[in-house]
Regions:
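N-terminal, polar/charged subdomain of small-to-medium soluble alpha/beta proteins
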Residues: 1-77
């Protein structure tokens, strides 16, 4: 699992998502996910949407994932 694989999974699952994923070791990842689909969602709900897109990979291939989830408007602020 690498940053690109995670990006593809998130973009495929969350409509209109713009995703940037980085990692120094392909085990610990940091993701910025921007989506209009996060509108009116709590932080927990947003993170759950991302975790759901990664499925069982969160239990096996991804040791840690730091998330920053934003709507397009929040990203401009």
């Amino acid at each position: 699992m690498n940053s690109y694989d995670i990006k593809v999974l998130i973009e495929a699952s969350i409509e209109d998502a713009v995703v940037n994923v980085s990692s120094d070791d392909n085990v610990h990842f940091e993701a910025i996910v921007i989506s209009q689909g996060f509108q009116e969602k709590s932080l927990v709900q947003r993170h759950q949407m991302v975790y759901d897109s990664l499925g069982d990979k969160m239990q096996s291939e991804i040791h840690a994932l730091s998330l920053n989830t934003l709507t397009p408007k929040e990203n401009l602020e």
